[in-house]
């Protein structure tokens, strides 16, 4: 067990913190530490496997466009851009620079629902 893990383990054990709460605290700490490390250097995505990459809104655009095609509910460029802008607004409201992929996916789902793209939303959730 490394030093940091031991410190955290002892703290959680000594304070009788529920394992589910531990998982949430560790996930939040990971995001907050990375956010501090990157500071104001743009926006970053924390991938599922732990890597960090520069945020690219074009990836969201292409994901939504491909999903709409797969759903048989083709969205035009303007429609997709509206969803992307909704996602960016949600990200900016958080006031940090590192976003886990699952959080960005949730924002896309919320934007699709809010804008009335139910069929695209269902397909997006299943991808």
Q: What annotation goes with each model-predicted range?
A:
Residues 1-127:
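Long, C-terminal-biased catalytic regions of enzyme "large/alpha" subunits
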